[in-house]
Every structure is written in structure tokens, then in C-alpha cells.
């Protein structure tokens, strides 16, 4: 499902545009990232620390690509967790 335009922000990372949104829960901040040109591609859903900075989105994109995230392909969302040691894959 594509991110809503009004409640999401755009980021350009290595000349590719992504759209992202965040949602706070009691335990963490959930960040969803998708390719702006293909909103129906694979989304990455990251659990981040409660103290969230916008530059963490770049880490999610970069490390997600290294873990096999392919936003240009239609697939189930990839679930990850951002920790002090980096991005780790987790079960959905």
C-alpha cells in the first residue's frame, strides 16, 4: 500500500527519490520508506529508537539495500530494526 502524500516526506538519496513517513508507538518509532516513482514496489518498515532523527532515513535506505531491499520490485514489505550496531532484519 502506498504512503499518503500529505503525511509523508520526500528524500533524495544518491539521485533517487524516496517517500517516507514515521509513526510513534509506545516502544519505538516505525518508519516506512518506498520508492517515490514506484509506490507499489517493496516497502521497508523499520523499527527505530524513540529518539528519531531524520538522517536515520538515509541509514535505513542504504543498509536496507545492502540487506536485499528492492523497492523497484513488487513484493511483501521488508521488516528491519535500527540499532546502535546498524540495521538488522527481523521476522514480520
Predicted regions and their residues:
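Ser/Thr- (and often Asn-) enriched beta-sheet segments in non-cytosolic proteins
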Residues: 10-12, 17-19, 32, 45, ...
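Acidic, low-complexity intrinsically disordered segments
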Residues: 40-92
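Short, surface-exposed, low-complexity cationic segments
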Residues: 21-45
